[in-house]
């Protein structure tokens, strides 16, 4: 790998920064050119080359010198064109979706800033630089989720996202501080010292990934984030914010892979997340929230692979997942515009006739998510299921991951049955599928079909002989078929059956295991106690001791003493004079 590669990466970063200063109409073409440029260094990836480039110093101190340093390896050079490609497609779609927004220029600039901060994470070679990008995607998600700040729900969702991510950020800060004081924040040096890494910074890494990638226990913010514009949801869930947590663990996996406790935590956390989110998605009818919970489920699958010591498979699934997930969100945005901002899939139907191309793209995206053979999702998901089935690590994790696979096929089919099939159930505002809609969706559709095959052809040079039983080999396909059949029954029950009493299991998953209740209760009570402590102990004590109350208490005794005087000065003087004279006469008589 020669100096052309870092030159190209630096050119891309500088061009993106310059694009922020230009009118938003040129952004689409700029991103297309940058994407084509970013494809040039892909050829050296086949040789597993790696290059580290150190630039100008960022912080100089007596104890630590921190330089701006980028690392160019397989992960960074492969994910950079993917992020550019998806942002290019989403930006072009946004020109139609946000056309009536008076601040569309600022919106496009926010999307570009979001992309830049993600590229900082991808190419960072030290923990401090990674933390800058980490905080960047956090603050940009806050601004974009709360874009429609006139809506109370959008403001609440933006605050919820940033607060949940603060919890994960504490873990990353703890890890960075620990590494800075004990070894080094340079990633190459961390990889060398992986044998002696303490468990505390590893806990911080897992906590950071849990918060950023919305794993179980810190998951409620992700469905709420759907209050933002649909292009924001597409970018957030495909190639930026939520994959940053898993990418962090993939990047720093060499310091994790020898710690069995942390790997077990990742395995259990990922398996629980993928099953829980898939089950919750089957209870929702908001199309964007279903897709959001689908993202959580797929992130749990990636976390499971990290727990099985297979970060390469997690990265492969991250790549394939980003294309069809972006396409799912953009298709849902087209539907929502067509139906006067209606997001309930029960109110949709017959969209194959009014939006034929969007419906076709949605079908392909859902089939890829289900793991339909020879689509891009199949090559990663099927490999993950086979790896799980052949692993002796944890049979419980295998079981609930298989349940999640069935449920993912279930809710994906449910989306298609409710939206595309049957007859319209609400008023349509038919719009022409312009090139700003079809072109990005067509590009994402091609990558959702071909990306898996291209990855296989470029990485697997020889055909591997299958040595596993046919039941294990076909396990993923069988699970998908079961999920499709199950969704047919669920759709029929939704349309034609009314429950006699509330379903507690349905309510449990629909309310996301009621995690909002303890989270908000603990927060509110903590704030109340803090406020009471501040006002009742600090403020009141200060006022009573040092303020007007304290001054009043100090001079009260003196005032009382003065008020006891009766102003009988003549009597007092006469008594004083007589006493004095008596004493003097007594002294003189002696």
Swiss-Prot record:
EC number in record: 7.1.1.2
Keywords: Electron transport, Membrane, Mitochondrion, Mitochondrion inner membrane, NAD, Respiratory chain, Translocase, Transmembrane, Transmembrane helix, Transport, Ubiquinone
Transmembrane segments: 1-21, 31-51, 77-97, 104-124, 130-150, 167-187, 190-210, 230-250, 261-281, 314-336, 355-375, 398-418, 439-461, 466-486, 568-588
Keyword check for Manganese: no
GO biological process, one term: ATP synthesis coupled electron transport
Reaction catalysis annotation: a ubiquinone + NADH + 5 H(+)(in) = a ubiquinol + NAD(+) + 4 H(+)(out)
GO MF, one annotated term: NADH dehydrogenase (ubiquinone) activity
EC supergroup of this enzyme: translocase
Keyword Manganese appears in the UniProt entry: no
Function: Core subunit of the mitochondrial membrane respiratory chain NADH dehydrogenase (Complex I) that is believed to belong to the minimal assembly required for catalysis. Complex I functions in the transfer of electrons from NADH to the respiratory chain. The immediate electron acceptor for the enzyme is believed to be ubiquinone.
Family the entry assigns: Belongs to the complex I subunit 5 family.
Protein name: NADH-ubiquinone oxidoreductase chain 5
Name of encoding gene: MT-ND5
């Amino acid at each position: 790998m020669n100096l052309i590669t870092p030159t190209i990466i630096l050119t891309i970063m500088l061009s993106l920064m310059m694009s922020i200063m230009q009118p938003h109409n040129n952004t689409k073409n700029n991103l297309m050119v940058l994407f084509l440029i970013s494809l040039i260094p892909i050829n050296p990836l086949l040789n597993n080359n790696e290059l580290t480039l150190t630039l100008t110093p960022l912080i100089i101190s007596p104890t630590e010198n921190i330089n701006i340093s980028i690392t160019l390896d397989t992960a960074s050079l492969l994910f950079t064109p993917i992020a550019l490609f998806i942002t290019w497609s989403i930006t072009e779609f946004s020109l139609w979706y946000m056309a009536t927004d008076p601040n569309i220029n600022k919106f496009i600039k926010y999307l570009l800033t979001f992309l830049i901060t993600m590229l900082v994470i991808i190419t960072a070679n030290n923990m401090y630089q990674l933390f800058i990008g980490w905080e960047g995607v956090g603050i940009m998600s806050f601004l974009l989720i709360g874009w429609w700040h006139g809506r109370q729900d959008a403001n609440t969702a933006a605050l919820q996202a940033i607060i949940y991510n603060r919890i994960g950020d504490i873990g990353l800060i703890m890890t960075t501080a620990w590494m800075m004081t004990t070894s080094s924040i340079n990633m190459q040096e961390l990889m060398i010292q992986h044998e002696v890494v303490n468990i505390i910074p590893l806990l911080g890494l897992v906590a950071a990934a849990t918060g950023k990638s919305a794993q179980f226990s810190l998951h409620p913010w992700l469905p709420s984030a759907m209050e933002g514009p649909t292009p924001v949801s597409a970018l957030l869930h495909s190639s930026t914010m939520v994959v940053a947590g898993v990418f962090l663990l993939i990047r720093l996996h060499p310091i994790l892979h020898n710690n069995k406790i942390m790997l077990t935590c990742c395995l259990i956390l990922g398996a629980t997340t993928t099953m829980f989110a898939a089950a919750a998605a089957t209870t929702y009818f908001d199309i964007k929230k279903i897709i959001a919970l689908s993202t959580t489920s797929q992130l749990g699958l990636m976390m499971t692979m990290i727990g099985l010591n297979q970060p390469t498979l997690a990265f492969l699934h991250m790549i394939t997942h980003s294309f069809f997930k972006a396409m799912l969100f953009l298709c849902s945005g087209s539907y929502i515009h067509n139906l006067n901002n209606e997001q309930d899939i029960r109110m949709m139907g017959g969209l194959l006739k009014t939006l034929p191309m969007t419906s076709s793209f949605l079908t392909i995206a859902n089939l890829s998510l289900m793991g339909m053979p020879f689509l891009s999702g199949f090559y990663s998901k099927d490999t993950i299921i086979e790896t799980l089935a052949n692993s002796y690590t944890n049979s419980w994790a295998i079981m609930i991951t298989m349940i999640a696979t069935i449920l993912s096929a279930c809710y994906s089919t449910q989306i298609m049955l409710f939206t595309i099939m049957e007859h319209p159930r609400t008023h349509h505002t038919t719009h022409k599928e312009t090139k700003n809609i079809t072109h990005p969706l067509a590009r994402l559709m091609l990558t959702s079909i071909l990306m898996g095959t291209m990855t296989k052809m470029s990485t697997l040079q020889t055909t591997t002989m299958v040595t596993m039983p046919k039941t294990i080999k076909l396990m993923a396909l069988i699970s998908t078929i079961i999920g499709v059949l199950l969704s047919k029954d669920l759709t029929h029950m939704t349309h034609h059956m009314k429950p006699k009493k509330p379903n507690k299991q349905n309510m449990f998953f629909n309310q996301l295991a009621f995690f909002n209740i303890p989270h908000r209760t603990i927060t509110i009570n903590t704030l109340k106690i803090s406020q009471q402590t501040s006002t009742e102990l600090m403020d009141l004590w200060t006022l009573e001791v040092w303020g007007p109350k304290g001054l009043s208490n100090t001079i009260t005794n003196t005032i009382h003493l003065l008020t006891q005087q009766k102003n009988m000065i003549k009597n007092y003087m006469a008594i004083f004079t007589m006493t004095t004279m008596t004493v003097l006469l007594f002294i003189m008589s002696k």
